[in-house]
Amino acid sequence: MELPLGRCDDSRTWDDDSDPESETDPDAQAKAYVARVLSPPKSGLAFSRPSQLSTPAASPSASEPRAASRVSAVSEPGLLSLPPELLLEICSYLDARLVLHVLSRVCHALRDLVSDHVTWRLRALRRVRAPYPVVEEKNFDWPAACIALEQHLSRWAEDGRWVEYFCLAEGHVASVDSVLLLQGGSLCLSGSRDRNVNLWDLRQLGTESNQVLIKTLGTKRNSTHEGWVWSLAAQDHRVCSGSWDSTVKLWDMAADGQQFGEIKASSAVLCLSYLPDILVTGTYDKKVTIYDPRAGPALLKHQQLHSRPVLTLLADDRHIISGSEDHTLVVVDRRANSVLQRLQLDSYLLCMSYQEPQLWAGDNQGLLHVFANRNGCFQLIRSFDVGHSFPITGIQYSVGALYTTSTDKTIRVHVPTDPPRTICTRRHDNGLNRVCAEGNLVVAGSGDLSLEVWRLQA
């Protein structure tokens, strides 16, 4: 799929031009949505897989610059009398953290040797054996990237042989469609079609008490929401949940999960983004709405940016990015209060993960797409087939790791290279919805009424 570049001169003011939404049954609306949006391509209508775009990427080659020789000459025989190339070869067998944080403190000569960014670039490219990163960055932190890559490869070595797996099947009585890790992976929230948001203590996994489920948010007499819980987002110790009942509820984890606010949206809330100064919702009635969570929360602005439901969104201090069933990706400039770009796609995006300047997204055809933020404009640079045969429902990207989930009943673990290298695939009895990774925990929601958890080596 080749996606055209969006223009960066769409300066229309972000004013409300919404149409009123008629009253509908949220359960019937949700079921119709799932059947339409998350179902696999129909037989005989298979989508063509795109050839990768020709944007150049970094790759290990013969022309790669050699690490600078900075080891001072010594008169006495010993380790430092070895050639720099041999010292670097020895270092390649040591953990990257040890080399960077311990070996560099031994002496000035070793500090100079391991402080050269070319040293770390060569080491990273040898580890991944593919072009990396997918989007070139001028001031890329090669030591940090190398540490993250090596940790990821070590944790999932031998097809994830050393990874602990837990299936938390008691707590929900319907499909789990949203997950969120908190406090470095110590706690987890899960939202389900049973209308509840559950709080889990993942520190109790594998213990004798096994008291993993802490509580269900809300009052005991009622469920958390009156409709399916479809989205979760957090800002520090505060959490919000979005539902097909057209509400967003706010919860304070520092106060034992007590509710401290509620927003009545115009339609079913399908996606959320929570920042210190704004809370953004994407709804079934095609709107993107901004609230100030510090005041009320108070409605700031809203607009119908799309012609179909808003399926995924994210925000930072400069942009609000939304993807819709209408096959568009819209970028709003927060500071100029205007639409910056409107990209027309050949498929619709279901999930996104952003670490500037890379935006990774999964679509309804089972494909991954990478957009680069270049001087404020997002450009599609690569499209990948990573083996998913059905829609990609969850994605999480970081500089050293990439996770994807799909209704094809798999979670796939990748290295974020060009193309991504899949190092582990775990299959399940039902479709997987959303994925979240933090610390040494990875979680995914399952259509099998369970929360799936993988605990990695610390």
Swiss-Prot record:
WD repeats lie at residues 171-210, 220-261, 264-301, 305-342, 344-381, 387-424, 427-458. Residues 16-26 have a biased composition (Acidic residues). Residues 76-123 form the F-box domain. GO terms for cellular component: cytosol. Disulfide bonds: none annotated. InterPro entries: F-box-like_dom_sf (IPR036047), F-box_dom (IPR001810), G-protein_beta_WD-40_rep (IPR020472), WD40/YVTN_repeat-like_dom_sf (IPR015943), WD40_repeat_CS (IPR019775), WD40_repeat_dom_sf (IPR036322), WD40_rpt (IPR001680). The modification Phosphothreonine is found at T55. The modification N-acetylmethionine is found at M1. The keyword Glycoprotein does not apply. Keywords: Acetylation, Phosphoprotein, Repeat, Ubl conjugation pathway, WD repeat. It holds the Pfam family WD40. The modification Phosphoserine is found at S18, S59. Residues 1-30, 42-64 are annotated as: Disordered. Transmembrane segments: none annotated. The keyword 4Fe-4S does not apply. Interacts with SKP1 and CUL1. Substrate-recognition component of the SCF (SKP1-CUL1-F-box protein)-type E3 ubiquitin ligase complex. PANTHER family: F-BOX_WD REPEAT-CONTAINING PROTEIN 9, WD40 REPEAT PROTEIN 12, 37. This is F-box/WD repeat-containing protein 9. It comes from Homo sapiens (Human). The gene is FBXW9.
